[in-house]
């Protein structure tokens, strides 16, 4: 059964939870903490549609749909191999009628593609500038993590084009680029309204930041208490707060 689902030896099938399984590429994008936290942080609108910018394997959209956060999601992905994975993962999990992959550049994504404005856009965008020295042996990973096909400004501008007035853009990003993120959001008329910093341990600096921005909103931001994933060392038991995220699929208890 598993072999029938895999197109090549470079693919694998991984159970995500009791509801979902994920087809992925062995040397490509994997399901990580950032994906789960983004899906948990996204505010639900069960009767509405949403757009994901940079879908990868589709795991964030799949998690949101499995928890009935949205009625339908369009996931934009520039890499053909991953757009194909999104379609196959949607079909595999019985969500083919609710998750659509759009293969293309987010810089050219407009409401003509989505069929109108939406109330929610979310993204785990590339976070390494082209000037960064780090490169990966995998071209797929470079495309996903480096700003080869759009900067955070481009992703914020795309979100703003697609959102109705008062719509929400939710993003997971690197804390060391928080200034650039906030500048990009405000230049796109997206006002940061909620923020949460994620630390591997209480003794570690933050490794992720989650931000919810609202189109056309006034100033004022709510900052959550920090989320510590592990109490002392990475790889051990989760903190009570992190376990609550997995149990409840929500970060509301931190605000």
Where are the regions that the model predicts?
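A generic structural signal for alpha->beta connector loops
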Residues: 19, 47, 70, 96-98, ...
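Residue-level signal for inorganic ion chemistry
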Residues: 38, 124, 155, 213
């Amino acid at each position: 059964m598993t072999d029938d689902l895999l197109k090549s030896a470079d693919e694998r099938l991984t159970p995500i939870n009791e509801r979902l399984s994920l087809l992925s590429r062995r040397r490509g994008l994997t399901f990580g903490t950032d994906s789960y936290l983004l899906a948990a942080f996204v505010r639900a609108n069960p009767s509405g549609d949403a757009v994901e910018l940079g879908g990868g394997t589709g795991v964030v959209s799949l998690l949101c749909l499995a928890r009935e956060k949205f009625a339908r999601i369009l996931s934009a992905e520039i890499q053909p191999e991953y757009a194909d994975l999104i379609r196959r993962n949607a079909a595999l999990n019985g969500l083919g009628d609710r998750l659509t992959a759009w293969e293309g550049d987010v810089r050219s994504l407009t409401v003509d593609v989505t069929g109108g404005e939406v109330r929610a856009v979310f993204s785990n965008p590339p976070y390494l500038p082209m000037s960064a020295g780090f490169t990966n042996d995998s071209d797929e990973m470079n495309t996903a993590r480096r700003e080869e096909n759009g900067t955070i400004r481009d992703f914020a501008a795309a979100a703003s084009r697609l959102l109705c007035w008062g719509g929400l853009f939710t993003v997971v990003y690197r804390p060391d680029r928080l200034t650039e993120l906030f500048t990009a959001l405000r230049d796109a008329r997206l006002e940061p309204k909620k923020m949460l910093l994620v630390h591997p341990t209480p003794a570690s600096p933050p490794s992720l930041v989650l931000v919810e921005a609202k189109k056309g909103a006034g100033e004022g931001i709510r900052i959550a208490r920090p989320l510590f994933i592990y109490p002392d060392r990475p790889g051990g038991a989760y903190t009570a707060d992190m376990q609550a995220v997995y149990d409840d699929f929500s970060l509301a208890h931190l605000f």
